[in-house]
Amino acid sequence: MRATNGPIISASESKRATEGRRSSALRATVFWLCASRCAIAYADGPLNYFLHADGPAATPTMRLGWALTALVAAVALIVTALLVGAILRRRPLAAERDAQHLQAEGGGMHWVWIGTGISSVALFAALAYVLVTLEAVAEPGRAPRLTITVTAYDWWWKVDYPSGATTANEIHIPVGEPVRVELQSADVVHAFWVPRLAGKTQTIPGVINEQWIEADHPGVYRGQCSQFCGAQHAHMAFEVIAEPRAQFDAWLENQGQPRAALSADATLQAGAQLFQERCAGCHSVRGTDAVGKQAPDLTHLGSRRLIAAGALLNTAANQLDWIQHAQRIKPDSLMPSIALTSADATALCAYLQTLR
């Protein structure tokens, strides 16, 4: 018989070990693929202000973020390198020093002073850069031609233009022009934030704060309340739509008009009557007897991309879903879930589609 130097591993155990290694490798691969996909998705996300800036009020802040991140990364790398070097370095023992007549190491304080000096210079440079950035975003380069008022409610945004136009959760601005935004709150503290266009500004009850935004390119920019304000804080979004001046002027003129005349169609008339009975206490439609002030103005509802403060796309089906199941979609919002018969739902939906 031949002696062995270790335990005998059966074929089945060897197979299980191989499968275990393959499974671990597969899990690691899946993890890194998922992590990479998440990183790519975040990089392209509408709220990513670290990699994207599309306006002069956001670009300096983005660059400041890069600079501070680079500074922190450099400090972390230097400290880590020094720490690893100190751990790996072998110093002679006391007995070895005595045998070789070596003196104990010392004189390390000069490194402390060097590190303190470099850190002080870096921190003061960072402070100076922060002050320069604050100055750059405090005021636009030229006086704004347009000032709008944005009022925050639980959990939606009212937008008023000087011409008398009123929208909800949707701000239109001319591209390439600074726009001053006056911010106020009707209930609690919120925060107005369009990451790719500007920084955050709080809306405080009884106080009017100001901010300015400007878009370098036409497009749709996501905005979000960034101050926790209750159960539906995460669903308190809005959009800033930047468009050429001529297109903006046409939009603004249309938004200032009252509701278009309603045809004599029986379904539309029934829908208008139902709206007056069930919705007019909170909502308003200019040009009608609906003058509610507690909820969004719906005069031009059909022209908006989203409803429910960004929770749903503005389609006929989603409008009806929102009306009938508001408390399921946004629990604790002031919008109640309204029970409707099939005929009433059809009539109300048809009426809402005319509000453009």
Residue ranges and their predicted role:
Residues 2-5, 13-15, 20-22, 26-175:
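Extracytoplasmic entry segments of secretory-pathway proteins
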Residues 251-267, 281-296, 300:
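Accessory recognition modules or surfaces
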Residues 250, 269-280, 296-299, 317, ...:
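Solvent-exposed, polar/charged alpha-helical surfaces in well-ordered, non-transmembrane soluble domains
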Residues 164-167, 246-276:
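Electrostatic cytochrome c docking/interface patches
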Residues 226-235, 272-297, 304-309, 324-333, ...:
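Periplasmic/extracellular electron-transfer cofactor-ligation site
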Residues 158, 172-236, 242-244:
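Membrane-embedded segments
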Residues 247-253, 318, 322-356:
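C-terminal capping alpha-helices of c-type cytochrome domains
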